[in-house]
Every structure is written in C-alpha cells, then in structure tokens.
C-alpha cells in the first residue's frame, strides 16, 4: 500500500517527546520477551486431552516427587517423567513438524492474497509527527467472511472431519511453535530495518517515541519504527502493523474456537451450550443435542466487531504511538489466538451444559459489556470525524493547545476510559462458561485409545487456566490506561489536568 503524497508536507525532523522506560524497562522487557513463549506452552500442555486440566499429579506434589520404591530415579527426574507423560510431551523435536510449517505459511499467504484481491476501503491514517499521512487498505471483515463461508461449506460436506478442523487439532502445539518463530523473526526483521530510517526522509518513515532508547533488547521489544512496511512481489507494499493487528491472529482465534467445537462434536456427538460460538452455523447440518439456549454470543462477536470497525484502529495507541516490535508481533500472532481460545480448548475435552438461567446471566453480561464498548467507541469515532453530527453535537468538551478535543459529558464524561469497562465485562462471558473448571481423564477399555472425563477431586483446579483471561485482561487494561494517561499528560499538559478535574474516574465510575 503506497504512502500518500497528496497530503504530505515536506518531511522534517519531529521534536521527540520526553519518554521514560515502560514495562519495567530493559529488565522487564527481557523477562517478558523470553517468558511469554514459556507461558504459552504452559497453557497448551497443562490443559490437555491426555490426563486432565491441570495434570492430576500437580495436585499431589508429595507423590509427584516420590519415586516408586524399586525405581532408581531421583525425585526431580521422576517428577519430570511423570509430567511429561501426563501432558503428552512430544519431545523437543516434536514441537514442530513440516505439516504445521506448511500450514502456517499457507495461512499467511492466503491472508495476503485476500488482502490484495478482495475489494477494500482505502483510507488515510492520522497525521504523522513529521507531516503527511499514510494510506491503508482495509478489508479484514470481507476476508474473514470469505474464509468462514469456505469453512462452512467444507463442514457441511465433511462435518467435524473437515480438514481444517482436524489439521488444527492434530498440530496444535506445532502451530504454536511455528507462530512463535515467526513472531521472533518478524520482530528481528523490523528492528534491523528500522536503522534505515533517517531524519528528514521522504518516505514518511519515522521512529516511535518510546522505541529508540538505545537499549537493544528494550527497543526490540517496544519497536523502533512506528509504521514499518514491506514490499512483497506480486502483492505490493504492506503495512506490517495494521495487517498483523487483525488478520492472522484475530481471525485465527475464531478458527481455533471452531476447531475445538468440531473436536467436541466428534468426541461426544453434540455441542454444549457453553461452546456456542458460531457452531450452529457450521455444525448445524448434523444431528445435535441442542439445549434451550441457542447461542452464547462471545468471542466471535468481539472479533467481528473489531474486523468490521477495522478503520478505527488508526486512532488507537497501537497505531499512533507504539512501534512495531516483539510486543505487538508476539501479541498479534501468538498470544491472541492461542491464549484467548483456551476456554474453547478446555470445553472441547470437558463439555459443560450451562442451563437456561446461567446462559441468561452470561448473555446479560456479554450484552452489557458489548453495549458499553460499542456505544462509547461510536461516540468517540463520530466526534473525531464529524463533531457536528447530531448524535454528538450536544456533547461538551475541552479544547487543548494541540487542537484536540476532550469530551467531558456523555459516556466519556463518566470515566476517561469508560470503553475499557465494556471490554473487560465481555471477557467474563468467555470464562464463566467453564464454571468451576477442572477435569481428569482416565483410560477405559470401552473403546480403543478412549478416556473417561470426570471432575472427581478436580473441581476448581483448572480455574487459574480458564479464568486467566479475565485477570490478565484487567491488568492489561489498567496498564494500558496508565500508559495512555502518561502520554496525554505529556501531550496536553495543563489542559489534561483540567480535564481530569472534570472527569475524575479512570475506568469504573465511583470505584477507579
């Protein structure tokens, strides 16, 4: 996607904002950079279809470290061997295979082809510090619809044995590994390319304010270049950040959910109400045990809202402030699809029937969260693009020295980041369907390679896994709010202080 010239002013060096370390500085960035893959593998293995979620031996540490009487193993070796067996450890060489590599590269290639071939909206981004605006091509929603229509057709023909679903379930850990490698490689690539950015360049390339501290690992994590782009033969110029923000990972998140739903159906012959995330569309052709509640609107609503509102990312912190480094690369390609789908993975092995009352409660939470999330963001987007629109013309605001307007009434008069409240409430509906999570699997002779699922002694043991998203997301949103507050305080100065006196609450009115 070419950079616009019509709106570009003469590119001049921009004055850099004072910017301190974030995320714990170089030490924090280092720990996060090498700790995140470990966390992803931990979630992938600890909630499994071999022994349980979590592995039962973890609930009895004394037994775990006590070898049998005739064993010549030391305690730690016995513990490692036991855990390896219980989590289905494939060995180091088994963490990756050719099938997964080819599948992932096909997925990224398909995403690029749909981006360039399907009709798209071409819009300009916000004005850069150095002047001018970049052009963006948006068709993520149409791309997703194309993909899911194809998957629906395949599922109608093949049912839960549709090749996409079986491929994902057969290679889950290997797919995780390949995406981790791509995330690291991409972060290294954009870091090295960022040193080509020169002050006063005519290509509208600029460094992120917080991404060139001089500390290699910290800058690699935060991202040195604000909007790195790459020219691919037969594809053209691709904005790496905006492309990775929604396509491979967000659409992949829903694909993982659907694959896990297919796995549950193949294993049990039905899909419980707790798993109703698009599954009626794709698997409804088969005979199902349908519960009173038809659909729990959850993760797919969030994803398709983001895809439909794709141009709105142009004014987010990710696009306007953060560089593209390991933080966004790993988050977009690995963390979002593989961690956010953990509840569906859990339910694929341990079906949970919620019942009408619990379904109604979760639907209410989801609907409330979505209403707050969408209403607040709509007000903000409309006000930014057309402040005279009748929907927002009555709202009061403070005008800053930079020309920006800060809303002080309506939704945005209740809290400075009220949209985060809706975002967090929606996260509840992803986790609550797992109830008091925890199960174990016991081999049975009824069928070959079959296991019985039970919750005996396991109820609640899986909560740290299936409810992790709620806690993590709360921390993420509070941390993001603090970062945004610091940025706005630097940018708006006294006007921001005045704004905070009028709009006192940060996220939750009356509480925080």
UniProtKB/Swiss-Prot annotation:
GO cellular component, one term: endoplasmic reticulum membrane
Predominant location: membrane
Bilayer topology: Multi-pass membrane protein
Xref: PROSITE patterns: STEROL_REDUCT_1, STEROL_REDUCT_2
Lipid metabolism found in the keyword field: yes
Keywords for this protein: Lipid biosynthesis, Lipid metabolism, Membrane, NADP, Oxidoreductase, Steroid biosynthesis, Steroid metabolism, Sterol biosynthesis, Sterol metabolism, Transmembrane, Transmembrane helix
Pathway: Steroid biosynthesis; zymosterol biosynthesis; zymosterol from lanosterol: step 2/6
Catalytic activity: 4,4-dimethyl-5alpha-cholesta-8,24-dien-3beta-ol + NADP(+) = 4,4-dimethyl-5alpha-cholesta-8,14,24-trien-3beta-ol + NADPH + H(+)
GO terms for MF: Delta14-sterol reductase activity; NADP binding
Any one Gene Ontology BP term: ergosterol biosynthetic process
Job description of the protein: Reduces the C14=C15 double bond of 4,4-dimethyl-cholesta-8,14,24-trienol to produce 4,4-dimethyl-cholesta-8,24-dienol.
Name under which the protein is recorded: Delta(14)-sterol reductase
